[in-house]
Amino acid sequence: RGMTLIELVIVIGILGIIVVTVASFQTNILSNNRYSFDSLSSAQDARTILRTIVKELRSTSPGNNGSYAIITAATNTIAFYSDTNGDGLKEQIRYFIATTTLKKGVIIPTGSPLVYNSNNENITVLAYNIRNSTSSPLFEYYDENYSGTSSPLTLPITITKVHLIKINLLIDANPNKAPVLRTYTSQVSLRNLKDNL
């Protein structure tokens, strides 16, 4: 005994609804999985970036040319001297945001006497989709009286007053979707600039 045409149409309709439902469910699962992976990857990248910045800032010291340890201190830029490769020479390190990209510039001193030639700066990209702004700065600076709740130093920063730097990294993990900003924060005391030892 066979199926009637009406029974066949009903079965095809039910199977069609099941296929559409399963496909929609699968698409949602894959989309959420991709978002979770992107977020996890972005979080790991941010932690790695923060660890590097903190390590380099912690060992800030005067340049080989006798310059003060910190060169520039602004909301989304910092430049300083630090021996990052253990060769005894202090590299000039600069972290800055260009549009929505976090970059790092390094100048190795050359010549005799040693000089830091800005034409020799090697710039690398650290992260994309950075959303820091003047109202949510990448760097905040504090003096030796920082108690944990004090306000940061006001602009323009007097670099000789800086003893602690707070780093706030705002990343948009997926710029193609509505902004879901992730904030990663760390702070560092500048060991070689302490005067309360």
What are these regions (language model features)?
Residues T75-S151:
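Type IV pilin-like appendage domain
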Residues I70-T75, F96-T99, I157-K161:
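Short, ordered beta-strand-loop transition motifs
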Residues M3-S59, L197:
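Aliphatic-rich helix starts adjacent to a transmembrane/signal segment
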Residues D38-S41, G86, I130-L197:
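Short linear sequence signals and composition-biased patches located at protein termini or domain-edge surfaces
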Residues R34-Y35, L40-Q44, L57-T84:
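Short, glycine/small-hydrophobic-rich surface segments
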Residues N28, D38-L40, Y68, T124, ...:
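Flexible, active-site-adjacent loop/turn segments at secondary-structure boundaries
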